[in-house]
């Protein structure tokens, strides 16, 4: 059976396919979702953001992280352009590493209601100490292959 042609970008509520201004803050950013055509199948989808940036809420200095987001979709998939815009909205947002990482995970869960989600925030050193932050919604569905996030611990020259 032929598929229905996609709606034109102008009539779609999604940000995908349209010129969209960068959101000024995470609160203003919109996360879009699209129907999961494989909703009866448990599988893992992964987003990797190796150049995530936020601001230290005390000094205003930039903080950098490598984020890895894994989730088992339910009825919805997270649309990647909206995720890119959401993550970019943190560039001028002040928050501690732990708050950024957990808030991103919770916001995605609220938007798409996955069966399971985990996020790893691998933050580059500030003051000589790297901070790695991990959060997940609970146990992964049984029988789902969950690959390692495969981000090595930060290591200096030693």
UniProtKB/Swiss-Prot annotation:
* An example molecular function term from Gene Ontology annotations: preQ1 synthase activity
Query: What keywords are annotated for this sequence in UniProt?
Result: Cytoplasm, NADP, Oxidoreductase, Queuosine biosynthesis
Per UniProt, substrate binds at: 78-80, 97-98
Q: Where does it live in the cell?
A: Cytoplasm
Q: Which GO terms describe its cellular component?
A: cytoplasm
Query: Its Gene Ontology biological processes?
Result: queuosine biosynthetic process; tRNA modification
Question: What InterPro entries does the record point to?
Answer: GTP-CH-I_C/QueF (IPR043133), NADPH_dep_7-cyano-7-deazaG_red (IPR050084), QueF (IPR029500), QueF_type1 (IPR016856)
Record-listed E.C. numbers: 1.7.1.13
Q: List the protein's name.
A: NADPH-dependent 7-cyano-7-deazaguanine reductase
Name the species this protein comes from: Nitrobacter winogradskyi (strain ATCC 25391 / DSM 10237 / CIP 104748 / NCIMB 11846 / Nb-255)
**Lineage, broadest ranks:** Bacteria, Pseudomonadati, Pseudomonadota, Alphaproteobacteria, Hyphomicrobiales
């Amino acid at each position: 059976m032929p598929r229905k042609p996609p709606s034109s970008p102008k009539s779609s509520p999604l940000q995908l396919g349209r010129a969209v201004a960068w959101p000024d803050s995470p609160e203003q950013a919109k996360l879009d979702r699209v129907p999961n055509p494989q909703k009866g199948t448990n599988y893992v989808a992964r987003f990797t953001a190796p150049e995530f940036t936020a601001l230290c809420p005390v000094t205003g200095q930039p903080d950098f992280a490598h984020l890895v987001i894994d989730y088992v979709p339910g009825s919805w998939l997270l649309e990647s352009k909206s995720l890119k815009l959401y993550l970019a909205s943190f560039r001028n947002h002040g928050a501690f590493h732990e708050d950024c990482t957990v808030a991103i995970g919770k916001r995605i869960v609220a938007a798409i209601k996955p069966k399971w989600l985990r996020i790893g925030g691998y933050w580059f050193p500030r003051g000589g100490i790297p901070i790695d932050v991990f959060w997940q919604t609970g146990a992964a569905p049984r029988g789902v292959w969950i690959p390692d996030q495969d981000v090595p611990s930060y290591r200096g020259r030693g």
